[in-house]
């Protein structure tokens, strides 16, 4: 029995050394003899020590593939994380840039629309204002040209009328004749009133009123008549412009009771009572 156990222990130790497996725990067999336990323990210790030394040497000489694989995976993971971080940051920056560019484009489109409308409206207003200004300038030029042409035609007509001896316009003739007719009518009325005083004497009140009216009326008549005569004599003298009768210098037509107006004569003399009243 003892020899069989020893052979089995040696066989196990040889198997452990050949397979390079980790050392197993010490197996103790309880047998009757104490002498047989001691050589078994000593042999087991020596075999275990030899196998452990060999295993440690092999572990030191040969690299562990699992550790290398784990280190490689860690390095790859670190590299992947280090590469992914800048990639993710660049991706985020690109996204931000795209968002900012889209916002800017939207703002530009939203802001350019009213600017374009304003520019179009300003262009339209400027065009309309320039068109109006050009039309006004054209109108003024046309009016100036027309006035110049009319002035030229007027000068030419005047020269022609003077050269051919044509009569003056009808407006001047009617103006002069109307002024002369009015002055003569007022003069006739005053002469008739003064003549009626002889046949039917007037009262004191009527005479005072007549004397008050006589001064301004005579002055107006004289001015009108003188204006008519001046207008007649300023222009070239013609038959219709020459007045019929002119008052003498230094005397008025109303002061001459004997000759108040051409065609009218006062034959009756003033009585003494009337003279006293006057």
UniProtKB/Swiss-Prot annotation:
GO terms for cellular component: nucleus. Pfam families: FRG2 (PF15315). It comes from the Eukaryota. Keywords: Nucleus. Residues 11-31, 78-92, 120-129 have a biased composition (Polar residues). Residues 1-129, 251-278 are annotated as: Disordered. Its main location: nucleus. Signal peptide: none annotated. Residues 1-10, 32-56 have a biased composition (Basic and acidic residues). Expression is undetectable in all tissues tested except for differentiating myoblasts of FSHD patients, which display low, yet distinct levels of expression, partly from FRG2, but predominantly originating from its homolog on chromosome 10. The keyword Ribosomal protein does not apply. It is found in: Nucleus. Disulfide bonds: none annotated. Belongs to the FRG2 family. This is Protein FRG2. The gene is FRG2.
